[in-house]
């Protein structure tokens, strides 16, 4: 009876509790490679907003959040160029609305456990726009989109 109770408890923990709890962001490694576009407090705010957003990845762990100013600028320019011929995306709309100098890209590494399976999302991107006066802003940043 004790073995069955322990097995049930372990199963409930692994298959019910873990998948439903908010993502663990407490051990995320933060890496910043900035060039002056945003000040330290703005970048810190973007990271905090991103970690708060990533908590919705129930049952996962955020391993790393990275900001690289050059990579962010390259991806923004590429997005602008791809949509310049008449296309549109959430990122290009944010560039039009907030200005290219107010949009940031963060890269995230996330590990998830689904039952007995582990998976990882390395390089998962998050896009934010700096608009501290907005009621929608968290730490001064408005979430725009996420993905690869």
Question: What positions do the PLM features span?
Answer:
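Hydrophobic H-region at the start of alpha-helical membrane spans
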Residues: 1-5
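Flexible low-complexity loop/turn motifs enriched in small/helix-breaking residues
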Residues: 8-120
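Short beta-strand edge/turn micro-motifs at domain boundaries
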Residues: 121-148
């Amino acid at each position: 009876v004790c073995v069955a109770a322990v097995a049930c408890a372990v199963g409930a923990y692994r298959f019910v509790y873990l998948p439903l709890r908010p993502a663990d962001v407490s051990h995320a490694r933060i890496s910043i490679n900035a060039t002056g576009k945003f000040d330290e407090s703005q970048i810190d705010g973007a990271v905090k907003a991103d970690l708060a957003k990533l908590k919705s990845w129930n049952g996962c762990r955020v391993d790393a959040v990275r900001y690289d100013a050059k990579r962010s600028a390259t991806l923004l320019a590429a997005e602008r160029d791809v949509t310049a011929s008449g296309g549109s995306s959430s990122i290009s709309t944010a560039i039009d609305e907030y200005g290219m100098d107010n949009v940031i890209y963060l890269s995230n590494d996330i590990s998830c456990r689904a039952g007995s399976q582990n998976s990882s999302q390395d390089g998962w991107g998050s896009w934010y726009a700096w608009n501290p006066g907005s009621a929608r802003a968290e730490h001064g940043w408005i979430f725009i989109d996420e993905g690869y």
